[in-house]
Amino acid sequence: MPRFVDRVVIHARAGNGGNGCASVHREKFKPLGGPDGGNGGRGGSIVLVVDPQVHTLLDFHFHPHVVAPSGKQGAGSNRDGAAGADLEVRVPDGTVVLDEEGRVLADLVGAGTRFEAAAGGRGGLGNAALASRSRRAPGFALLGEKGQVRELTLELKTVADVGLIGFPSAGKSSLVSTISAAKPKIADYPFTTLVPNLGVVSAGDHTFTVADVPGLIPGASEGRGLGLEFLRHIERCAVLVHVVDCATMEPGRDPISDIEALEAELAAYRPTLQGDSTLGDLAERPRAVVLNKIDVPDARELADFVRDEVAERFGWPVFEVSTVAREGLRPFIFALWDMVRTYREAQPPVVPRRPIIRPIAVDETGFSVHPDGQGGFVVRGTRPERWINQTDFDNDEAVGYLGDRLARLGVEEELLRLGARPGCAVTIGDMTFDWEPQTPAGVDVQMSGRGTDTRLEQTDRVSAAERKIARRERRQSTDEPGGEE
């Protein structure tokens, strides 16, 4: 069973908004109590929250479906439905959120950082909220909006100041375990380290973090071995350290060729966070070289021989280190701290964001109408599509209310301007219907009363006046001679 997972695909489904309620107030001696249907509750959203106690995406590996609760339906007596609780999902520090097309949506760094992965749907209005002077007792309510459904990719990128890179069995894990309290798995065979290991290093009164990245091989930037997974974890490192094994050199290999091979892989790798200007490109970040395992006599001789050549060729500081004899570690640690401190001092000061008391207004009144190439038209826009989803098409009065809203927005006038004819197919969102214009362009649309809509040829709703006439006719029929006794 995997214990460390750094890339998962999750299916986030936010909660749906609750439907509004259509009800009439009933009380003794109050025959015209008026509408009292409550609004539906808001659906719960899915929020990703950085938790320092979480270090892997393992939970999502077994449970990729994340579902937030939906809002409750409104009720009579002006009772609003309960809102669905937001679902807070804990993720590790350094998690990057990508959409289905690979675009970066969020870079979650720092404890408590939040990102709304999927927004909950808004609750539908009850008939009490829909009442107006011309529609005093609406016989319908609006449906709740569907919650947002998204497929997101989560990638964990290690957050460390220094990244140790090198070929397998170069001694990176031994080095990080010696200069910090980290206890990675150490063995004398390649690819012992399969997951990044983090360690906190003390340099006097200062501390910084070091990441032991699993071994790299030529072709890692193209996915050979586990290269792409390994290279992902050095994107955030401000300083990169080449760890070279001077004790077990193979024929045709030397420290300089090893460094050049790894640099070629770093140059070919295209990080996900290409827009992170604070760190810059991988090729621009400061480097250092560690000639490791100098406790072996042949390794010390090789390190002394190539040290000046490496420094002259690459222009980076070079350190001869032995983790077994704990030789050369102190100057190496303080040199790393100087490089990390230089990076930190170059960063712009963090300016706290001012809280937004009044959110920025978003213009949702815009819409567009385009021919579909088959004699029909397609209407696109935030409001029209939302209104379609909120309409109960089994209720004639709700359909009439939708027509009023679309006409007031100008959709009908725009269709007439583009040459739409009665009976042509009009598509809004997921709904396609035959369009029948009821008002000429430029005429204000008057809201219809309860149970009546001039655009409907027939309605199954019986008005109060019709019921009164029916009762009068029944009484007259019983009073006539020969009627029921």
Curated annotation (Swiss-Prot):
Residues 160-341 form the OBG-type G domain. Its EC number is 3.6.5.-. Mg(2+) binds at residues 173, 193. Keywords: Cytoplasm, GTP-binding, Hydrolase, Magnesium, Metal-binding, Nucleotide-binding. CDD domains: Obg. Its cofactor is Mg(2+). GO terms for biological process: ribosome biogenesis. It holds the Pfam family MMR_HSR1. Residues 439-485 are annotated as: Disordered. GTP binds at residues 166-173, 191-195, 212-215, 292-295, 322-324. Monomer. This is GTPase Obg. It comes from Mycobacterium sp. (strain KMS). The lineage of its organism: Bacteria, Bacillati, Actinomycetota, Actinomycetes, Mycobacteriales.
